[in-house]
Amino acid sequence: MAEITVGQLAQQTNKEVDALLKQLKSFGIEKSSEKDTLTPTEMKTLLEKINSAKNTATRKKVTSVKLDGKHKINVSVKRKRRVAKKMEQQESTTLEQPQELETMVQEVSQQVDIVKEQDNIEQIVENKEAVKVQEQRQAEIAKPVIKDSGFKITAMPEIKIEEIVAEDDEGLAASDKQAKKKAAKKVFSEAVNTNTKYKREEEEKKSKAKKAGGKGFKKANPRQLSQLAGDLESFDEFGAKKGKLKAPKVKKQEFTKPVENTVRTVEIHEGITVSELAQKMAVKGAEIVKVLFNMGVMATINQSLDQDTAILIVEEMGHKYTLHNENALEEAVTIVDRSSYKKISRAPVVTIMGHVDHGKTSLLDYIRQTRVVAGEAGGITQHIGAYSVKTDKGSITFLDTPGHEAFTSMRARGAKSTDIVILVVAADDGVMPQTEEAIQHAKAARVPIVVAVNKIDKPEADSDKVISELAQRNVIPESWGGDVMFVNVSAKTGEGVADLLEAVLLQSEVLELEAFAEGLAEGVVIESRLEKGRGPVATVLVQNGNLKQGDNILCGTEYGRVRAMHNDLGKKIKAAGPATPVEILGLSGVPAAGDEMVVIENEKKAKELAAQRSQKQKEAKIAQEQSLKLSNMFNNMGKEGEQQVLKIILKGDVQGSVEAIRESLLKLSTDEVKVDIIASGIGAITSSDVTLAVASTAVVIGFNVRADSAAKKLAETDGVEFRYYNIIYDLIDDVKKAMSGLLSPEMKEQIIGIAEVREVYRSSKFGSIAGCMVIEGVVKRTNPIRVLRNNVVIYEGTLESLKRFKDDASEVKKGLECGIGVKNYNDVREGDQIEVFEVIEVAKEL
């Protein structure tokens, strides 16, 4: 055998060099590196070691020997089957057997001596079967006979090794016999150890009995002695525990008193869960789930139930119920007793309404003698302003509403919180869409109208036209026998403004407006916003009571303490009476415009009620989303394609503007493109808005607000673009364009040419060839065609050939003759028309 290096051997055996070196070292072959060579002798030694390891199979068999009672002894038999010479096996067997027998005899004699040295204890031991071997091994250990000489075991059974018989699985008698002898020795030693263990337990019980009885056995309790004797009798001569002899049970004739089921009164609130209902009825949730299943409702323990379903479950399970009044706290807190207060006359609350750019703010500006219009972008009022004006005949509170169509909800709120509506109509424009809408809101709120025909100073002004148009909409002037006062005014020159104020005060006298000037204040939120350094700021119109600085107030889902109050001129005030607009600071958040404002004496109750309202809003929103998902699922069934979503983050200067823009943008949604406003708020654009825009791939829109420096830096890093607007028209138009870009283009067919068949020829190569005259447009070889007969489409396909005389042509223009071969169609007749068209993509528009 040729010499080989360690590295070559490792490569041939697919082993690592280090692992091979360790294996060689374990076989007694010392090598240090992969370059060392292996001699033929070393290779032979290595092969013998490997073969001897492979030819040895260790087998382990575990059986259990039962002692009397509940105890078992596990017998583990290990044997090795080795393929070797017979002589070696016989010699090893001959040498090992005498030594093993002598060792076993010595160990057995030692164990017997240990047992003989134990203390003599009186015990009556019955002769029982000592050891039972498993039935499959078919061997037994003979029963020993021990003399009754107290508790001391005077003789041990002689265990003969020849009596242990085992099955020979592999036919190797010598190795099996050797393993069986070892197993018998182990069984015997374990039996002796067990006996010794129980002797120790007996001594411990004896000592415990002595302690219980005092100094000696004589003073022991007889009951304890009998119990100890019973314990000692439970062991046999091998120390194995006997089976317990149970005394026969004496049957007693007893009468079980019937227990009446507890009937509970369960308080049920809307949206109660299965687990809550189960807890109130003191039953498991699974039982209620079973009842629901029998009713045909699949539910889990966390499922919310409506009150009707919960009532059925409670009655089904035999309990009583009471319905929880969720408005109990709100009624207790918000209802104010004013029976002890007197009413006084108050100033009228007047809302100026009308179409865009008809001069509402200019008219109010003239009345207030200030210049507010210059601050509004494009001369359009972006949010509601509340102002108090004092005249010679009394005070008037004005609410200015935007005229744009997006601010419908604002006008609706303005109509609800007002006493008189001044409808401004431009004399040169007449009645416009928002004018009609203002009339509808005023009539719905049952508020009297005073019409101000504005811009009367213009040459093209026509007040009679305005009167006739309004009369068609049931706004009848007093001169025509109606109840509506018409006043011609000019916000530019001030003409007729005094007459308008006099008409308003006259109307208020007719209405006999009164309010409580004392007690806890009530009002309505006209506008709200978030100002840097001041926090949430709300413009509130007080309707009843006296609002004072330091009062605990509740506005919708927000609460707080009035830290400061300012009037419409920006001056700090300590108190505000009915029909007074004020700005208040100190709320926990920005309330929604139109929320009711109430003063609550207990701040804790205000906080609790605000949390309850917030929870109701969340539950209503979740329920609405679930119903929308369900309806959308049915509506979208059968529709192909996926709906595109334009995600928007909207930030504005005031709550009313944000709400109005939100409603306008949501109305733009179609079946193909949906507007999803994932976040909206008041104040500057912050870095959190940018992070949200990056995570959700949304567009950030700011209305009359800008991004702070941190947001700008983050936007430059993440590539987020801000869109700033100060006029609502531009914002809505840009969003429409963005939505149009998300629309999938529409495929449209356009006819580019028509050829009339004049004669038909037969060709062996192409079949029927139509001799045609192009009567319209151009016929192109590559475009699809239709064959028309009597203006009815009879075939649609493509051209196989287009020839001008004998030459192939790519296209033939109007007025020229050509030969046309239609692919896979031979039924061309004279008088047919071949229509050539093309498919083009057309961008969709909203």
From Swiss-Prot:
GTP binds at residues 354-361, 400-404, 454-457. Residues 198-219 are annotated as: Disordered. Residues 490-492 are annotated as: G5. Residues 207-219 have a biased composition (Basic residues). It is found in: Cytoplasm. Residues 400-403 are annotated as: G3. SUPFAM superfamilies: Initiation factor IF2/eIF5b, domain 3 (SSF52156), P-loop containing nucleoside triphosphate hydrolases (SSF52540), Putative DNA-binding domain (SSF46955), Translation proteins (SSF50447). One of its GO terms (cellular component) is cytosol. Residues 454-457 are annotated as: G4. Belongs to the TRAFAC class translation factor GTPase superfamily. Classic translation factor GTPase family. IF-2 subfamily. This is Translation initiation factor IF-2. It comes from Francisella tularensis subsp. holarctica (strain OSU18). The gene is infB.
